[in-house]
């Protein structure tokens, strides 16, 4: 939403899920009337309502190893808003291969983390976290819970990373892993 409000010209969104009532406490881009609707369509409608001059392109698909390179090729900056380790490593690996800058973020309960990768300017996600943790070593967001405001805080910071990169202003979180606790 903040990218649309900032006037970022073209925004791509990939997700195969539909809006569920359980999403609404943390995904405020959707509302109760969107339950059952494709998440990408709901998000597009909200962003276009905020700024009708923004072009929102939707991809109703899960991102996988077969689709990711085609999905990211036309974008200047990639934002990882996923909630699982395999997807985070896939996005990292594709962006490193394609020499695409991206913002990683992760949240759980009251905590979040964020880092930005720019080719040639700092470590990537896999450089910091060599491999995904063993299965069941870390609870999923569904198991542990997520406080909706945490997603808002970290998502806003990711939007600012994208805006700073696009405008070429300020210092990005390259070479840093920002951790944040709301407690």
Predicted regions span which residues?
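Adenine nucleotide-associated cytosolic modules
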Residues: 1-183
């Amino acid at each position: 939403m903040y990218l649309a409000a900032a006037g970022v010209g073209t925004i791509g969104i990939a997700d195969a899920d539909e809006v569920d009532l359980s999403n609404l406490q943390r995904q405020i881009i959707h509302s109760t009337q969107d339950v059952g609707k494709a998440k990408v369509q709901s998000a597009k409608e909200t962003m276009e309502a905020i700024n009708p001059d923004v072009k929102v392109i939707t991809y109703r698909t899960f991102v996988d190893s077969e689709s990711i390179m085609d999905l990211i090729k036309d974008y200047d900056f990639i934002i990882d808003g996923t909630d699982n380790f395999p997807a985070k490593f896939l996005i990292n690996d594709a962006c490193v291969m394609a020499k695409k800058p991206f913002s990683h973020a992760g949240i759980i309960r009251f905590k979040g983390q964020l880092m930005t990768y720019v080719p040639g300017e700092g470590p990537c996600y896999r450089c910091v976290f060599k491999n995904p943790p063993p299965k069941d070593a870390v609870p999923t967001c569904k198991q542990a819970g997520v406080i909706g405001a945490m997603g808002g805080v970290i998502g806003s910071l990711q939007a600012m990373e994208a805006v700073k990169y696009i405008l070429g202003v300020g210092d990005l979180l390259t070479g840093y892993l920002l951790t944040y606790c709301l407690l």
